[in-house]
């Protein structure tokens, strides 16, 4: 919920209605990101946002906005107990990999990365980079996301990128604190960093993290790695 500051204007309506108020901005935000992708000739993976589908139910979704003007939606499949209790969110059903002009990618929102089966299904579809947008309020919650993300990189012989929200929002109910450290993780083998960390942001600090990844190294790993997780399952 990277756009959570917009929810402050709905505080007086209660948490369940405030999140639906935030959902009113989702289509406009998607359009703006699509315009940015075209204008700057880049592919953009948005953070997640609340979204009301045709069934009238509320979901947590995000968008891949390609530089060619097309977009795809991804959904959070597993919602947390707090998301159910406070906001009435529902788990989605879509689990897809996406083709881009850079790589075949997958996206899992926050809690979803803690379920190994999801990334395994995407790895079977040829996923090379897994992106994990997340929002965690405590270091405990952040550690769950981070440690699981690093495990997914090893298990699936892919790169994993996590990007989280930082800072405090004292005027937004149920979203007042966030803790994160964004990073780029790799498999752990000879061609990669020994600790599986390609790049890391400063803890709990707003910043831009830039990193290159070599997809050819993944192909070599699949065939010549010292261990071969994908083949040996």
Where are these regions (language model features)?
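CN hydrolase (nitrilase-like) catalytic-core segments centered on the catalytic cysteine
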Residues: 22-45, 114-205
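Active-site catalytic loop in hydrolytic enzyme cores
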Residues: 22, 31, 35, 51-125, ...
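Short, conserved active-site loops that position catalytic residues or coordinate cofactors/metal ions
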Residues: 1-20
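Residue-level detector of high-confidence beta-strand sites
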Residues: 61, 71-76, 193-202, 210-212
